[in-house]
């Protein structure tokens, strides 16, 4: 009973009905000439997304579903995880066509920046052997990924390839 109450309280506190907009948010997802500050926040957010995913990969304790797909393809093909993430993103963008989804600048940059950050940063991150440190690394990765997603969504310059597929 108490647990049920606490869960409802938690959900009510952390539930957003729409993505917030800030002074630097784009007025339109298909804006082809966003403010420089909006573009900077978008790029910063996408770098954080890539870094968060990389930290999760390096922890070897579990990753997001799309990254599992990229990892599996990486193992089977011998390509890097970043390259397979890029290939998956392009394939997912092709699935937007029947949905009549339109990519924004954020969509294109997401397709490019996240895989590049994964490939550039992965060689520098440790893979902890102790489960305690793996869990700590996962927590850090999830927090960084969440912050990155927040920045890129608030920039409002188009969804990432996977987001657009799921919301289209």
Language model: regions and residue ranges:
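Core subunits and conserved enzymes of cellular information-processing
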Residues: 2-168
């Amino acid at each position: 009973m108490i647990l049920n109450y606490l869960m409802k309280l938690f959900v009510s506190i952390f539930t957003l009905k729409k993505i917030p907009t800030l002074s630097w948010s784009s007025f339109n997802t298909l804006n082809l000439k966003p403010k420089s500050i909006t573009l900077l926040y978008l790029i910063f957010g996408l770098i954080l997304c890539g870094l968060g995913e990389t930290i999760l990969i390096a922890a070897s304790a579990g990753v997001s579903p799309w990254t599992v797909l990229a990892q599996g393809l990486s193992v089977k093909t011998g390509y890097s995880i970043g390259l397979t993430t890029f290939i998956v993103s392009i394939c997912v963008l092709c699935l937007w066509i029947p949905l009549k989804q339109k990519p924004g600048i954020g969509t294109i940059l997401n397709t490019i920046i996240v895989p590049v950050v994964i490939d550039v940063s992965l060689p520098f991150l440790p893979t902890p052997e102790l489960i305690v440190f793996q869990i700590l690394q996962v927590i850090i990765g999830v927090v960084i990924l969440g912050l990155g997603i927040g920045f890129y969504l608030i920039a409002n310059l188009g969804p990432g390839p996977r987001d657009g597929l799921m919301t289209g």
